């Protein structure tokens, strides 16, 4: 009986976050993005996730630390599809430049032990400051850095599909 209870308990923990779907990314594109050649991605600070198992008197074994910088991830994605990043917005390039902003909007509980990280990305015309495109997306991975990476890629894919 104890063995059955233990198996049921393990199964409950293993499937606590399963079966819950992420919300589909919501994207709004108001203008042709490909009329722009340059992007200025507003700098963000890095996000770090750590995990580990304590191994006794000699410290942590099997630990892992991951760090991502959302603005660098967004910049890399945009470079890959043909945009050129610029370090600042200049007057001579303003009419061909998008200003891209990223924001972390929190978490959404998915199940007993799982949650999704939610983000928003906005793209504005550098000259007029009008909204050109935006998206809201969420991601759920092994840790917070994976969650944010998934959400960024999901949102950008929705904008550029």
Task: For each feature predicted by the language model, list its residue ranges.
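Surface-exposed short loop/turn segments
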Residues: 24-25, 58, 67-146, 150
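Short, solvent-exposed cationic patches
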Residues: 150-161
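Sec-dependent bacterial lipoprotein signal peptides
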Residues: 1-20
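Residues embedded in well-ordered secondary-structure elements
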Residues: 7, 30, 110-112
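A structural "domain/chain start" motif
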Residues: 17-81
């Amino acid at each position: 009986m104890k063995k059955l209870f233990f198996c049921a308990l393990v199964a409950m923990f293993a499937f606590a976050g399963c079966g819950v779907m992420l919300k589909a990314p919501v994207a709004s594109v108001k203008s042709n993005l490909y009329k722009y050649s340059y992007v200025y991605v507003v700098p963000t600070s890095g996000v770090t996730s750590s995990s580990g198992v304590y191994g006794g008197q000699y410290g942590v074994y099997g630990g892992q630390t991951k760090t991502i910088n959302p603005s660098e991830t967004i910049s890399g994605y945009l470079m890959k599809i043909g945009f050129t990043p610029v370090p600042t917005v200049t007057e001579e390039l303003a009419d061909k430049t998008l200003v891209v902003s990223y924001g972390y909007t929190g978490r959404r509980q998915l199940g007993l032990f799982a949650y999704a990280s939610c983000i928003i990305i906005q793209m504005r015309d550098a000259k007029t400051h009008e909204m050109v495109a935006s998206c809201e997306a969420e991601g759920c991975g092994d840790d917070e850095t994976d969650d944010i990476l998934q959400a960024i890629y999901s949102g950008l894919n929705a904008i550029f599909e």
